[in-house]
Amino acid sequence: MIRLFHVSDVHFGAEDQAAIAWFGEAVRREQPDAIIMTGDLTMRARTAEFEAAAEWLESLGRPVTVEVGNHDLPLYNLFARFVRPYKRYRRLERMIERPLEIKGVAIVPLKTTARFQFRWDWSKGYVGRKALARTLKLMRRVPNDDLVFIAAHHPLVDVGTRSSGETRGGQRALEAVAAAGAHAVLSGHVHDPFDVPHGSGGLRMIGAGTLSTRTRDDPPSFNEIRIEGRRFETIARKMGVPDEAVTVAG
C-alpha cells in the first residue's frame, strides 16, 4: 500500500505549534511515501516565515512537493509581489511545484495563484493558460499505467465548503486535466477536508484542512491518502480524535 500525507494551509506566522508537532510525529512514526503540501505555507510571505517553513519541511525527511498559495505572495509590498514574488522561496526552491513519481503514482503540480487579477480579491484562484499548458505537458510524460494526482492550492471548482476558491479558469482546467487522464485534484485554501467525485469519469476532488490556528471551528487536520492498485481512499486525520481516522465522504 502507498500512503501519501496531504497537508495544507500551515500558515507559518499563525501556525498551531501543537498541530505542527502532531503532524511531524505522525510523519516520523509512519513514514509516508510522500508529502503533498498544497499551499499557504506562510501567513504573510515574510522571510522569517519561509525560513521556519523550510526548516520544518526539511526536518520531515520525506519526499515533498509544495504548491504556492495566495498567502505565499507578498501582500503589502507591491514591488516584491510584482517584480520578485518568489525571492523568499530560495531555500524551498527544490520543493516548489516539484513533480513526484512514487511507485506508480504521479503527483503533477498546477499553479492557481496570480500576482494580479482583474478583481478586488486577489486571494481567489486563477489558472492561466501557461500554467495549464505546463501541467498538461508534465502529464504527457507520466507512464500510462500511473495514477495521476494534480496538486493545486485552490479548488478548481467550489464544492460547497464554508469558504470558496472562485477559481477563474478552474472549470476549463478541470475539464482539461480530466480529459488528459487525471484521477484526482488535491487542493487546500478553504480549510475544510473533502473528497467528492466530479463528473462521470471518476475524477475526484480532494481538499485538506489546515494545521494553523485558522481552523474555522474544526480541529487541525491533514489527509492521508491510501492507495492499493488503482483504488484509493482519503482519510481526514483530525487532531484530538482518539486513535481513529475519519473517513471523508466520497
Q: What residues fall within each predicted segment?
A:
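Beta-strand-turn-beta hairpins that frame and shape the catalytic cleft
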Residues: M1-F5, P99-P109, R140-L147, H198-R204
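N-terminal active-site segment of His-dependent metallophosphoesterases
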Residues: M1-S59, L75-Y76, M95, K137
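Active-site environment of divalent metal-dependent phosphoester hydrolases
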Residues: G13-E15, M43-A48, N70-L78, A114-W120, ...
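Extended active-site neighborhood of metal-dependent phosphoesterases/phosphodiesterases
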Residues: A52-K137, V142, A176-A178, N223-E224
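Conserved beta-sheet core of the metallophosphoesterase superfamily
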Residues: R162-R230
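Short acidic, glycine-rich surface-loop motifs adjacent to enzyme active sites
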Residues: M139, P143-V159
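A short C-terminal boundary segment appended to hydrolase-like catalytic domains
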Residues: R226-G250
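Active-site neighborhood of phospho(di)ester-bond hydrolases with catalytic His/Asp-centered motifs
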Residues: H6-S8, I35-D40, V64-N70, K111, ...
